[in-house]
């Protein structure tokens, strides 16, 4: 796996699924392929994206700044600086300085990542802030190792949180989660179906599913009533794909 492929994988792992994730993936691919060279426009676009947390925007801004060639004197962006200040905690800053000194001795991406993984997310963000604000310099490879270590920690925390939700025994949370997933799947079906004639059936199924979820929420239904809703939708989607001559069995 190439270095930039690895960076793209880690960065995308912390972004919530949805159209915005696909858009960011495209931007990263373009940047890494050297196709997008307007850092100013890229940062302005990133700043105005909804949904993303300030830290995620800070990490993306840091990656773009590292990989898009730009003039030396280009102004640093406030939204990135604020996100990478370790919540203003002096402990984070102290640890960030210690980490920075260790990173200065590292030569490789993987070496930097290994060193960084033993620090807290706050310290890692502060260390990125040091480098972003030009208070310290490391090689691009080492800086990207720091990025990936930070993303790995965030993704681990997200995974723990998702797992807790998936394994919760609270029937109300499970019920709502199934309805949200069914609704999201229906939305994806509508986007994939597009405007072809054969798509009418898939669109109809998706539309009915969304109306059903809306009705269930409006009148309040028994928590078990949502069981299998998403799976039924996915079966319909796969049947539609089969008729279209597409074989994709990887949705479950």
Curated annotation (Swiss-Prot):
The keyword Acyltransferase belongs to this UniProt entry's keyword annotation: no
Gene Ontology MF term list: RNA binding; structural constituent of virion
UniProt keyword list: Host nucleus, Membrane, RNA-binding, Viral matrix protein, Virion
InterPro entries tied to this protein: Flu_matrix_M1 (IPR036039), Flu_matrix_M1_C (IPR013188), Flu_matrix_M1_N (IPR001561), Flu_matrix_M1_N_sub1 (IPR015423), Flu_matrix_M1_N_sub2 (IPR015799), INFV_M1 (IPR037533)
Motif Nuclear localization signal: chain residues: 101-105
Any one GO BP annotation for this protein: viral budding from plasma membrane
Gene Ontology, cellular component aspect: host cell nucleus; membrane; virion membrane
Location in the cell: Virion membrane; Host nucleus
Coiled coil: none
Record has Membrane as a keyword: yes
Stretches the record annotates as RNP-binding: 165-252
Topology class, membrane: Peripheral membrane protein
Recorded family membership: Belongs to the influenza viruses Matrix protein M1 family.
Role: Plays critical roles in virus replication, from virus entry and uncoating to assembly and budding of the virus particle. M1 binding to ribonucleocapsids (RNPs) in nucleus seems to inhibit viral transcription. Interaction of viral NEP with M1-RNP is thought to promote nuclear export of the complex, which is targeted to the virion assembly site at the apical plasma membrane in polarized epithelial cells. Interactions with NA and HA may bring M1, a non-raft-associated protein, into lipid rafts. Forms a continuous shell on the inner side of the lipid bilayer in virion, where it binds the RNP. Determines the virion's shape: spherical or filamentous. Clinical isolates of influenza are characterized by the presence of significant proportion of filamentous virions, whereas after multiple passage on eggs or cell culture, virions have only spherical morphology. Filamentous virions are thought to be important to infect neighboring cells, and spherical virions more suited to spread through aerosol between hosts organisms.
Note: Most abundant protein in virion. When expressed alone can form virus-like particles in transfected cells.
Self-association and partners: Homodimer and homomultimer. Interacts with NEP. Binds ribonucleocapsid by both interacting with genomic RNA and NP protein. May interact with HA and NA. Cannot bind NP without genomic RNA.
Record's protein name: Matrix protein 1
Native organism: Influenza A virus (strain A/Chicken/Hong Kong/37.4/2002 H5N1 genotype X2)
